[in-house]
Regions:
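Short alpha-helical DNA-recognition segment
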Residues: 16-35
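DNA major-groove recognition helix of helix-turn-helix/homeodomain DNA-binding modules
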Residues: 44-61
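Residue-level signal for the short linker/turn that defines the boundary of a DNA-recognition helix
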Residues: 6, 16-17, 43-46
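DNA major-groove recognition helix of helix-turn-helix
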Residues: 37, 55, 63-66
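A short, Lys/Arg-rich alpha-helix, primarily the initiator
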Residues: 1-14
């Protein structure tokens, strides 16, 4: 089972997005995307929704609750 950071990175790469591109879509810094992808910290609930929207998946998919 993938962790949240690995899921974010995998989905980002599948969409062909760079960290700066995803950061702009979500409204955070480039560094924050790196922090999340490396499991240093997890995004707040409000950013989970923005990530899900940017990556075109549900929050449940991000959290590994559904495939």
């Amino acid at each position: 089972m993938k962790g949240l950071g690995e899921t974010i990175k995998s989905l980002r790469l599948e969409k062909g997005l760079t960290q700066p591109q995803l950061a702009k879509l979500v409204g955070v810094s480039n560094g924050m995307i790196s922090i999340w992808e490396n499991n240093i910290n997890e995004p707040k609930a409000s950013y989970l929704k923005a990530l899900a929207t940017a990556l075109d998946v549900s929050v449940s998919v991000l959290l590994g609750e559904e495939a």
